[in-house]
Amino acid sequence: MLYIIGLGLYDENDISIKGLRAIEDCDEVYAEFYTAMLQGSSLSAIERRIGRSVKVLGRGEIEEERIPIERALELDVALLVAGDPLVATTHTELLIDAHRRGIETRVIHSSSIISAAPGLAGLQAYKFGRIITIPFTSDNYFPTSPYTNIGENLKAGSHSLVLLDIEAHRNRYMTATEGLRYLLKASEKLDDGTISGETLAVVIARAGSEKPLVRADKIATLVEEDFGDPLHCLVVPAGLHFIEADYLVEIAGAPRAVVERMIL
């Protein structure tokens, strides 16, 4: 049996009771933190919470050597992952491989930024369009597709959840400020008027913690601010319902003049 168990958003206390009980039944417990890492926790804290030792696997050990699959041929194995298990394609591929090899599987879900961010931003979840990721750029690599995809969402009247690149193995996490700078640079490069310094955006930091940060304003203001420790993400809203607008003012600190022009 292969269990893929979500650890949730922020720390070791986010794992579900169902997940803890499944771990009790497992012969071996593995984890991967290259797709994401719990920023409010550590391996030792996770081990204390679940009462088991955990072997952390690298990308090659999972995607090439298929260690969880090989071990699950004979044993009950748990693979712990940050967030919700099936958001990452890597974990979906493991389930496909396990099914083809006759291994029984069970997925135990947990909280994810995909569902948490719309709620924290006070925006109606069904109004979100395609999820966007801004990658780390360089002098030789500057894709504009994240920017244009946000534009497509805006044209459709859909909010955009914008995830920011991480390189967990390097302890490198894109900040909201870096993401906003990307949007302004892409806007300057394409010169299409989709996004500007006057565009409303929402910054979310440390979702799942006791005190997550939610801050809304025009990009020109936000890009000058410091949002503290990771993880960060962005939301670029389309047209707003009046309740969404009130939330951004009252909870996220947006100037009313900035959001009122967005009310449908």
From Swiss-Prot:
Annotated S-adenosyl-L-methionine binding sites: 9, 84, 87, 112-113, 164, 207, 232
Gene Ontology terms: biological process: methylation; protein histidyl modification to diphthamide
GO MF annotation terms: diphthine synthase activity
EC number: 2.1.1.98
Pathway: Protein modification; peptidyl-diphthamide biosynthesis
Keywords, in A-Z order: Methyltransferase, S-adenosyl-L-methionine, Transferase
Catalytic reaction equation(s): 2-[(3S)-amino-3-carboxypropyl]-L-histidyl-[translation elongation factor 2] + 3 S-adenosyl-L-methionine = diphthine-[translation elongation factor 2] + 3 S-adenosyl-L-homocysteine + 3 H(+)
Family: Belongs to the diphthine synthase family.
Oligomer status and interactors: Homodimer.
PANTHER family for the chain: DIPHTHINE METHYL ESTER SYNTHASE (PTHR10882:SF0), DIPHTHINE SYNTHASE (PTHR10882)
Annotated function: S-adenosyl-L-methionine-dependent methyltransferase that catalyzes the trimethylation of the amino group of the modified target histidine residue in translation elongation factor 2 (EF-2), to form an intermediate called diphthine. The three successive methylation reactions represent the second step of diphthamide biosynthesis.
Name of the featured protein: Diphthine synthase
UniProt source species: Methanothermobacter thermautotrophicus (strain ATCC 29096 / DSM 1053 / JCM 10044 / NBRC 100330 / Delta H)
Upper lineage: Archaea, Methanobacteriati, Methanobacteriota, Methanomada group, Methanobacteria
